[in-house]
A protein has these predicted regions:
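Charged interaction scaffolds used for protein-protein
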Residues: 1-11, 31-53, 59, 71-116
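Short capping micro-motif at the N-terminus of alpha-helices
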Residues: 14-16
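Short low-complexity stretches enriched in small and charged residues
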Residues: 21-22, 54-56
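Active-site helix/loop of acyl-thioester processing domains in fatty-acid/polyketide metabolism
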Residues: 68
Length: 116
């Protein structure tokens, strides 16, 4: 699944596939699904006004965004150079736009075989 966004007047493609959780673990040494759940819970708390902003790990947002871009374009350099190539980068806005893409890996798509 892919999505193209315009960031800092550049078109950037983001992609999630079956290997996204594995790449995330290899790149950042953290569990993709655990981080997605953590962020989802933090965002729910923000919406209800009960969030403790000091407990939200904003690095996770940046890491997931970078990984989805790197999955779409293998030529992207390291995370520091990539983010540094933008004059500005609205992390939370971009993250919001990519939620459907991220959640695609968490939805059940395997159908159970029917018994004869």
């Amino acid at each position: 699944m892919e999505k193209v966004l315009t960031i800092d007047e550049r078109k950037v493609t983001f992609k999630a596939d079956g290997a996204t959780p594995l790449r995330y673990r290899a790149q950042f040494n953290r569990d993709y699904f655990a981080d997605i759940i953590s962020i989802t819970n933090s965002l729910k708390d923000l919406n209800t006004g009960e969030a403790d902003l000091s407990k939200i790990n904003t690095t996770i947002f940046s890491d997931i965004i970078y990984l989805l871009a790197k999955t779409a374009d293998k030529e992207i350099g390291d995370i520091f150079d990539w983010y540094g190539s933008f004059d500005s980068f609205p992390v939370f806005e971009v993250f919001g736009e990519l939620q459907e893409l991220m959640m695609a890996n968490m939805q059940q798509t395997v159908k159970k075989a029917k018994k004869k």
